[in-house]
């Protein structure tokens, strides 16, 4: 049984971790922290978890207690894991970080996008980017795993087959992405109010979103060279979901794109390449650790359109974190994650 600690259990990714781990036959959450809710029973904050975590209460983060865990998840704002990850690693505890703290390899680049100096640059070299479809073998041997962001997950999985095969013009890629409101987090903000988001949709951060350097970093690895990417995120009136519409120009029109995608993801338990001509819906992955993909070449031209959908809280965050845990501890990768999406 893997003993699990969670730092930051009161946000959406924290409660999603609790929900998923409640169904995991080989994991036990033994400590969950929140400075603001210390002493409050988990079931009192989250009634949906009644009967699953009886006796477990939020506590103030304590290195000794957390260090007794096999693995600690950080479901915290950026900067928090910087301060604690090193001490936990020194105690022999594995760290899986859902924040952006260790996703970028360049500390200066991180500081540029997150507006503060990187707090643990000495750990960047050993941090493994936790996209299992790319780094599965590195994840198996890791001590510190950086779980990819939601937009980067959907976007990279959509572009990877094209770039790895070298059949797309990597200098001109476009990612037009839509997100549900839960992607903004649980904190109170005017822009997330029901009356502000319902029956409306808008683009934001067109000048540059924090996920842009992360996406570029991953696509650069796949292409083996620098990439040109235009990334435009949108806020949509739904709670969960990411829908990425991705555009690329093919340089070899002889390639069977459907076969290319099917072959690339044939052995991936959480990537579903849909039949040719399909249009995946975000509702089909709600609550599931799945990326559902369809590839199109309109009018048999040079432009490829890839449609990629995920649940931003599951495959885009907590589900992918549990997937990483399974790999890290030599468990069946699908353990605790095989449930279907919720319809309607």
Swiss-Prot record:
Amino-acid biosynthesis listed as a keyword: yes
GO biological process: L-arginine biosynthetic process
SUPFAM superfamilies assigned to the protein according to its UniProt record, in alphabetical order: Glyceraldehyde-3-phosphate dehydrogenase-like, C-terminal domain (SSF55347), NAD(P)-binding Rossmann-fold domains (SSF51735)
Active site: residue positions: 150
Chief place of localization: cytoplasm
Cellular component per GO, a single term: cytoplasm
Pathway noted in the entry: Amino-acid biosynthesis; L-arginine biosynthesis; N(2)-acetyl-L-ornithine from L-glutamate: step 3/4
One Gene Ontology molecular-function label: NADP+ binding
Gene3D superfamilies assigned: Dihydrodipicolinate Reductase, domain 2, NAD(P)-binding Rossmann-like Domain
InterPro entries recorded: AGPR_AS (IPR023013), AGPR_type-1 (IPR000706), NAD(P)-bd_dom_sf (IPR036291), NAGSA_dehydrogenase (IPR050085), Semialdehyde_DH_NAD-bd (IPR000534)
Disulfide bonds: none
Catalytic activity of the protein: N-acetyl-L-glutamate 5-semialdehyde + phosphate + NADP(+) = N-acetyl-L-glutamyl 5-phosphate + NADPH + H(+)
UniProt keyword terms in alphabetical order: Amino-acid biosynthesis, Arginine biosynthesis, Cytoplasm, NADP, Oxidoreductase
Keyword Cytoplasm carried by entry: yes
E.C. code: 1.2.1.38
Subcellular location: Cytoplasm
Coiled-coil residue spans: none
Record's function text: Catalyzes the NADPH-dependent reduction of N-acetyl-5-glutamyl phosphate to yield N-acetyl-L-glutamate 5-semialdehyde.
HAMAP family found in the cross-reference section: ArgC_type1
Annotated PANTHER family: N-ACETYL-GAMMA-GLUTAMYL-PHOSPHATE REDUCTASE, CHLOROPLASTIC-RELATED, N-ACETYL-GAMMA-GLUTAMYL-PHOSPHATE REDUCTASE, CHLOROPLASTIC-RELATED-RELATED
Family: Belongs to the NAGSA dehydrogenase family. Type 1 subfamily.
Protein name: N-acetyl-gamma-glutamyl-phosphate reductase
Species name: Pseudomonas fluorescens (strain Pf0-1)
């Amino acid at each position: 049984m893997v003993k699990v600690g969670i730092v930051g259990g009161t946000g959406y990714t924290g409660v999603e971790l609790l929900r998923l781990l409640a169904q995991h036959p080989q994991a036990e959450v033994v400590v969950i922290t929140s400075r603001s809710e210390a002493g409050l029973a988990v079931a009192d904050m989250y009634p949906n978890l009644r009967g699953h975590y009886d006796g477990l209460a939020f506590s103030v983060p304590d290195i000794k207690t957390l260090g007794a865990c096999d693995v600690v998840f950080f479901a915290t704002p950026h900067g928090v894991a910087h301060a604690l990850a090193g001490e936990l690693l020194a105690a022999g505890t594995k760290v899986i970080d859902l924040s952006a703290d260790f996703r970028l390899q360049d500390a200066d680049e991180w500081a540029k996008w997150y507006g503060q100096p990187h707090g643990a640059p000495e750990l960047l070299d050993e941090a493994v980017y936790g996209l299992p479809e790319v780094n599965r073998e590195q994840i198996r041997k890791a001590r510190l795993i950086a779980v990819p962001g939601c937009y980067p997950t959907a976007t990279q999985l959509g572009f990877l087959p094209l770039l790895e095969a070298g059949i797309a013009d990597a200098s001109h890629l476009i990612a037009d992405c839509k997100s549900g409101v839960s992607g903004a987090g649980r904190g109170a903000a005017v822009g997330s109010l029901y009356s502000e988001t319902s029956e409306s949709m808008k683009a934001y951060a067109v000048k540059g979103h924090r996920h842009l350097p992360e996406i570029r970093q991953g696509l650069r690895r796949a292409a083996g060279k620098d990439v040109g990417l235009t990334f435009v995120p949108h806020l949509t009136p739904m709670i969960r979901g990411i829908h990425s519409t991705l555009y690329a120009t093919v340089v070899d029109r002889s390639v069977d794109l459907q076969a290319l995608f099917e072959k690339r993801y044939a052995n991936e338990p959480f990537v579903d390449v849909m039949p040719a001509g399909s249009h995946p819906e975000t509702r089909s992955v709600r609550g599931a650790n799945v990326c559902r993909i369809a590839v199109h070449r309109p009018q048999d031209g040079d432009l490829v359109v890839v449609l990629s959908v995920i649940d931003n809280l599951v495959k885009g965050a907590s589900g992918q974190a549990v997937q990483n845990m399974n790999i890290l501890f030599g468990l069946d990768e699908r353990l605790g994650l095989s449930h279907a999406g919720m319809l309607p």
